[in-house]
Swiss-Prot record:
Keywords for the protein's UniProt record, in alphabetical order: Oxidoreductase
Name recorded for this polypeptide: Uncharacterized NAD(P)H oxidoreductase YcaK
InterPro entries: Flavodoxin_fold, Flavoprotein-like_sf, NAD(P)H_dehydrogenase_qn
Top-rank taxon, per record: Bacteria
Enzyme class: oxidoreductase
Length: 196
């Protein structure tokens, strides 16, 4: 089924980062394909990633009311069929901002538990990796991170999940390579959107 409405979440402290440019390329390509996009820039939204007792899951109470921020952000997800998450891979994981979003918003009684689930049919993760692909694969990180993200989605009832790794996003060997390599990264995410 072709995606019609994407919820695009991204996390990077700098609005002019490569992560921001990749998120923008995804947004633009989706619009070219007549896909509606709602974008959540966690940093510019001033999202608070810190879990508080108010938002801590209550395993005995599926009807728990969480903070207004959590319910507002969860309600934004409801009218979308596809989630795209863009983030830099720091220490082989999410930035704390994105982890906090997942912990707080994809909460028990909302995104999972007792028949609850995220409203998406598809999730696409786009991870920006600083190092080279060969080392990333050889050390097992590509498989480990892919398995982790896909299994998280499976736990939430979403089987159509995939990960795009954009490697070599920190080190470039000169301006010419930089420009052409940047275009190749954009091409990868455009292809990802086209396949939605």
């Amino acid at each position: 089924m072709q995606s019609e409405r994407i919820y695009l979440v991204w996390a990077h402290p700098r609005h002019d980062s490569l992560t921001a440019h990749i998120a923008d390329a995804i947004h633009q390509r989706a619009m070219e394909r007549k896909i509606q996009v709602t974008e959540l820039d966690l940093y510019r939204r001033n999202f608070n990633p810190v879990m508080t007792p108010e938002d801590e899951p209550d395993w005995k109470n599926m009807d728990k009311r969480y903070s207004p921020e959590v319910h507002q952000l969860y309600s934004e997800l409801l009218e979308h069929d596809t989630l795209v998450v863009v983030f830099p891979l720091w220490w082989y994981s999410f930035p704390a901002m994105l982890k906090g979003y997942i912990d707080r918003v994809w909460n028990n009684g909302l995104a999972y538990g007792d028949g609850h689930k995220l409203p998406f049919n598809k999730v696409r993760w786009v991870a920006l990796v600083g190092g080279d692909k060969e080392s990333f694969v050889q050390m097992g990180w590509e498989k480990n991170i892919s398995d982790y993200l896909k299994n998280m989605c499976s736990y939430l009832g979403i089987e159509d999940a995939d990960v795009t790794f954009l490697c070599n996003t920190v080190v470039f060997d000169g301006e010419e390579l930089h420009a052409s390599y940047y275009q190749s990264l954009l091409s990868q995410v455009r292809d990802m959107v086209d396949a939605l």
